[in-house]
A protein has these predicted regions:
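Conserved glycine-rich "GG(E/T)P / GGGxP" loop and the immediately following alpha-helix
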Residues: 23-152, 156-162
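Canonical Radical SAM [4Fe-4S] cluster-binding loop centered on the CxxxCxxC motif
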Residues: 1-35
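Generic structural signal for short, flexible, solvent-exposed coil/loop and linker residues
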Residues: 2, 6-9, 41-43, 50, ...
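Bulky hydrophobic/aromatic packing residues
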Residues: 21, 99, 201-203
Length: 213
């Protein structure tokens, strides 16, 4: 059984995404520190997680050169427990040395043109493109994206996930259309708390609860 531990990072962010659940809902993700990894091994073991996903709270690759000690420590812990790993990022032109350690990289795309920037750095690695479904997205847009991915040698998986608005409420844009194509042409992710969440030695079972009081 696959069980994810989602490590929420906050190294800072470029704040260029058209919609940001963290910024728009004023979620206070704790600042990421090296000492904040002290309980990561226990979190993996106690929750019996076999997959670790790194996301934000700010893009995990933001100013990555200043945080190589954090990445070295975090990934060493994952390897100790033989965890499958993935990284979420919206940086298409950055591939730090530690990225080769991930089994999957999830690229957060804003438009179909972002797909042109995705390519395989390591053949063992899966590339997934993910789009947040916005109010202006059409069925034709979704179909064009799916067509491109199906013909791409560099993108292995495609997913669409629903937007969470400024009141932390899930929207359901193109819901029926996306659900009909789920596991056929793409993965459709309705927003929910699927994972165990970890940030700065704290474990929660809802994303929102990882935030500072």
């Amino acid at each position: 059984m696959t069980k994810f531990l989602s490590v929420i990072t906050n190294f800072g962010c470029h704040y260029t995404c058209p919609y940001c659940i963290v910024k728009n809902n004023n979620l206070k993700i704790p600042k990421t520190t090296l000492a904040g990894l002290d309980c990561l091994a226990n979190a993996i073991e106690n929750n019996r997680c076999n997959c670790v996903s790194f996301s934000g709270g700010g893009d995990p690759l933001f100013n990555w050169r200043e945080h190589t000690d954090w990445w070295d420590k975090a990934l060493a812990i994952c390897f100790r427990y033989n965890c499958w790993t993935e990284l979420h990022t919206s940086y298409f032109n950055e591939y730090p040395y530690f990225c080769s350690a991930f089994n999957r990289i999830v690229f957060h795309c804003r438009s179909i043109s972002d797909l042109y920037k995705i390519y395989h750095h390591d053949r063992h690695q899966y590339n997934r493109a993910v789009f947040v479904v916005t109010s202006d997205m059409t069925e034709e847009d979704v179909t064009a994206i799916a067509d491109y991915v199906e013909n791409s040698d560099d993108i292995d998986e495609l997913s669409f996930r629903q937007l969470v608005d400024d009141h932390y409420e899930t929207k359901y844009y193109l819901h029926d259309f996306l659900k009909a194509g789920h596991k056929k042409r793409w993965y459709y992710i309705e927003q929910n708390d699927y994972n165990v969440y970890y940030a700065e030695n704290r474990v929660t079972y809802r994303y929102r609860d990882i935030c500072l009081e």
